[in-house]
Amino acid sequence: MTSRNETLFQRAQKSIPGGVNSPVRAFRSVGGTPRFISRAEGARVWDADGKAYVDYVGSWGPAIAGHAHPAIVEAVREAALAGLSFGAPSEAEVDIAELICELMPSIEMVRLVSSGTEATMSAIRLARGFTGRDAIVKFEGCYHGHADSLLVKAGSGLLTFGNPSSGGVPADFAKHTIVLDYNDLQQVEDAFRARGGEIAAVIVEAIAGNMNLVKPLPGFLEGLRRLCTEYGVVLIFDEVMTGFRVGPQGVQGLYGIMPDLTTLGKVIGGGMPVGAFGGRRDIMEKIAPLGSVYQAGTLSGSPVAVAAGLASLKLLREPGFYENLGARTTQLVTGLAAAANDAGVTFSADSVGGMFGVYFSAAVPKSFADVMASDRDAFNRFFHAMLDAGHYFAPSAFEAGFVSAAHTAADIDETIAAAREVFARLG
């Protein structure tokens, strides 16, 4: 009998390219039929056939407090009753801007947008306007949204389909993008010596999450900061994924390294479409209406989305929030690694805060090349077996996973028990 998921996917493919509104959702990397989600609550999602899953996708990061958290739902309800969109400033915009500036150590001023892509696109434009230079340094496997100049060896969904770069990006745009290897500081130093006077910005996922989870090697971020300061280059930390996810001050708080600009998204929207970019006051004052760098958006600062974001950020400030989140995530990765080891399966796992990576490789990857050398076929078999058992991991070997505050120790134990059975079959 055809499942409701299959029926919906067949319908969707007739009116939506690939049947999805973001490519990784199509399950092309892992094969099979994507799950159409009908509802979500706490640590679980339910598909169109009524099957429940312990969820480790978390809407790709935003659901840090769990799905449909009552405080966030109530904040959205109250805001919606007062009006869905004004196209004018509101007090809530000021509230969330002040809170972001208070929480993020490098941000002195912040501009709200409606997505992470808008945030990184605007930050790049601002860096170019501020420096008067054109070239941008990015790192292979790091994804910064789908702006043309950043869709070069961009990881994430592009890797899922075997294409490191996107069609439709003019060579004239791409020529200003210098792509280097993540965690290779010597390569960055060489590029700066050769072209330092042309470089407007270095943009980096300070902890990579779009080629699975890859942490910076000791000295890498410090070296980027040193070189950018020396050459007058704007250092941009893309914390769309890691901001408020890996800790209360993001990666910059964990490592004590201050970028010039930071891009945010996901968690700051509480599940609604919100992004932001912010940083040094002297740079941010170049944005219109104060300066010549133009940026605008009809729904930027949406009162409903901002209400969700404010409620989400307030939850993160509760005592013990990050300690408990980190404990659950550590429980998951250590349990999965132990289960794989007991079954003789080549496997490793890593985590930071509420973010984790699973790899079918003997060691945790330290580079894009390491990630590409992992066993993707083994991951695909693991993914489907866990999905059948009611545990929803990201449908790609190149995506990080997420734990929420709603996950209990019992939820994690249930996942580890299922994984033990799966690894026994894989071994």
UniProtKB/Swiss-Prot annotation:
Pathway in which this enzyme or protein is active: Porphyrin-containing compound metabolism; protoporphyrin-IX biosynthesis; 5-aminolevulinate from L-glutamyl-tRNA(Glu): step 2/2
InterPro entries associated with the record: 4pyrrol_synth_GluAld_NH2Trfase, Aminotrans_3, Aminotrans_3_PPA_site, PyrdxlP-dep_Trfase, PyrdxlP-dep_Trfase_major, PyrdxlP-dep_Trfase_small
Keywords tagged on the record: Cytoplasm, Isomerase, Porphyrin biosynthesis, Pyridoxal phosphate
Keyword Transcription regulation belongs to the record: no
Enzyme class, broadest EC rank: isomerase
Domain of life assignment: Bacteria
Biological process according to GO: protoporphyrinogen IX biosynthetic process
Main localization category: cytoplasm
Name of the protein this chain belongs to: Glutamate-1-semialdehyde 2,1-aminomutase
Organism: Aromatoleum aromaticum (strain DSM 19018 / LMG 30748 / EbN1) (Azoarcus sp. (strain EbN1))
